[in-house]
């Protein structure tokens, strides 16, 4: 959630974070 890229940060919320 913090070590992920900025682009993935947005999808991370609905992807796996």
Swiss-Prot record:
It comes from Pelophylax ridibundus. Disulfide bonds join 12-17. Keywords: Amphibian defense peptide, Antibiotic, Antimicrobial, Disulfide bond, Secreted. One of its GO terms (cellular component) is extracellular region. It is found in: Secreted. Belongs to the frog skin active peptide (FSAP) family. Ranatuerin subfamily. Antimicrobial peptide. GO terms for biological process: defense response to bacterium. This is Ranatuerin-2R. Its main location: secreted. Expressed by the skin glands. The keyword Secreted applies.
């Amino acid at each position: 959630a913090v070590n992920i890229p900025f682009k993935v940060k947005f999808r991370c919320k609905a992807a796996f974070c």
